């Protein structure tokens, strides 16, 4: 297969090789990169874990994972190529001897080592220390870290300080997989390559913005993790705020890594603080009760296996976000995310202001607003809703909302739309950090989120119940209705 010019020979070391993330996401993504010819012929993939496996045992585990989680049959020729890259190192992250063994396996000149931490953040410090003591932290070595990076600003700083003791910021790749989604990446092109939007992307023309990330699933057996995190920490602090920054950022001087990140940080620093004085006006917490999702009976959050029956952890959050800068002053951003909602979808809806003069007042006291809908999943694409005259001989101008719909899969005729992890893994191999989160981004997001969490805690605020299979508590509808607006109806 042809190798792209940006591919580099590297050693990809996966800590937590037998874990859920590696099996469900990383290995299938590596298979697809192999299929597309993006992996350099000399690149190796080394699984790391405490299991007493040899290379053959690990190869068997990888094959089983691919056969389970790939969405297509395993190609024998591709499998042969991929399996030839595989190796395994038995290692306990607290054992220095294990890192010495890993160092022996990696003892090759002019190769980049990518250390992917597919393990809990509580282990990151020990892994970095082990790599550092074994001399495996020198550039161009890289580390890739998964969320959650802490549970608040203080704990996030502890983790980042542990990593920074052994790795420079230019070596650190913090993953938010939403940044690898094709439609999120398309936001830059949509906004800055098209004069239709580039010249009309501020408070002069935009009325408000809605960002919805909805999940049909519950906690999927992750009670221990989720009850400590909740929807605010699990989704708002990272995914939704990252999407918000991509929508709200000003044009960067160029598309280099730090220019883009600098603009995103400016947005985070401009978020209006939410505290006890306004938290009940602009936020809603919810917790699902039993109900029906897609016609199937599902238990409530407090009825899930292993549940603490007195838990006040939120499974739904809606927030009105105000950005205090010249571009967005007076334009609210409404964020909404939850579990056990009617359907799985992620979308951004930009509502444009109506013309100052309504020439069609005989038919419409208020015109329906033009909308730009950016679908992040499941059917990635962009939809514009505009008004057109309904054909006919009627002397009145009867208008109808018309959709201009661009579906990525149909428009670009691609059988396989690259998964976010495929792109992010490839970017780590290329050494490009633009799609990863810089430390100051993480910490600015935590500052804003912590203020809300503290306000909830001080008021002993309990989440409002909502039935599984509905769009969250009634209070979330009331919050946006008070502003004279309504949530976009997800189709």
From Swiss-Prot:
Residues bound to NADP(+): 50, 92-93, 147
InterPro entries assigned to the protein according to its UniProt record, in alphabetical order: G6P_DH (IPR001282), G6P_DH_AS (IPR019796), G6P_DH_C (IPR022675), G6P_DH_NAD-bd (IPR022674), NAD(P)-bd_dom_sf (IPR036291)
E.C. numbers: 1.1.1.49
GO cellular component assignments: cytosol
Annotated metabolic or biological route of this protein: Carbohydrate degradation; pentose phosphate pathway; D-ribulose 5-phosphate from D-glucose 6-phosphate (oxidative stage): step 1/3
SUPFAM superfamilies assigned: Glyceraldehyde-3-phosphate dehydrogenase-like, C-terminal domain, NAD(P)-binding Rossmann-fold domains
First-tier enzyme category under EC: oxidoreductase
Gene3D superfamilies in the record: Dihydrodipicolinate Reductase, domain 2 (3.30.360.10), NAD(P)-binding Rossmann-like Domain (3.40.50.720)
Molecular function as annotated in GO: glucose-6-phosphate dehydrogenase activity; NADP binding
Reaction catalysed by this enzyme: D-glucose 6-phosphate + NADP(+) = 6-phospho-D-glucono-1,5-lactone + NADPH + H(+)
Role this protein plays: Catalyzes the oxidation of glucose 6-phosphate to 6-phosphogluconolactone.
Family membership noted in the UniProt record: Belongs to the glucose-6-phosphate dehydrogenase family.
Listed name of the protein: Glucose-6-phosphate 1-dehydrogenase
Protein species of origin: Dickeya dadantii (strain 3937)
High-level lineage: Bacteria, Pseudomonadati, Pseudomonadota, Gammaproteobacteria, Enterobacterales
Gene that encodes it: zwf
